[in-house]
């Protein structure tokens, strides 16, 4: 079984890498991290112009009509550049949830806005510490009205809309959870940015006060849909991490070749060689696993949750 990417995918990778090298150098990333802006707006517009935000969105809804393999390619380059934009929350989570469960009206309203960079989306799942589970979701939905708090919500302080997991039953089963789509700008939602260990990923607390919401998908199937979205997002985040690991390895190699000690590059010392070799093996293993995940994601294989 061949998990390698095609020549077309590699061409897409080269285009994405060139674009991000020009528009998202380390200096630009540092400007966002050290400044007051929560993301790079110019880069976000540029990604939309390149078609990267809508690469997995069908052409019917304003996207490129490609697929998840192409999105994996873009994800790796986003991680390599440490791009300070709400890409994962909007593309991996919100857009995928709408594609999976949204009505035709919801798809026609939000997907073109995502592809054009006019809308930022997120998934409001967590309600404090701990792993996500149906039991951990307590925010109630009554008559499509939400009241409660979600935190942390990735990029919640800058999001235009959110996919919200809420409780619609009390049986103690997974079927107690349903998904809702909330237009944050329409009112009924207070967003407060949270202090985060990783400044490249904004987190927020969203407070819903008699907030009107639209059901996203059938009532009682929210947890099943969330699980599918998270499984796919895990693969895409893995590609971002592989991209970052590869770039770190390249930087370490270059430093080892340039740094002189005792009259020769430190890369010539056996201890440094061993360190770089171990890094390479770890990065290659991660890449292999990610490629397997990309295959599972693109074919909807049963192995995906694993």
Q: Where do the model's predicted regions map?
A:
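C-terminal helix-coil-helix/basic helical segment that borders enzyme active sites and/or dimer interfaces
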Residues: 27-35, 253, 257-264, 280-306
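Short secondary-structure junction/hinge motifs that connect adjacent elements
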Residues: 27-49
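Residue-level signal for inorganic ion chemistry
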Residues: 9, 20, 74, 103, ...
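A short core secondary-structure module
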Residues: 124, 149-190
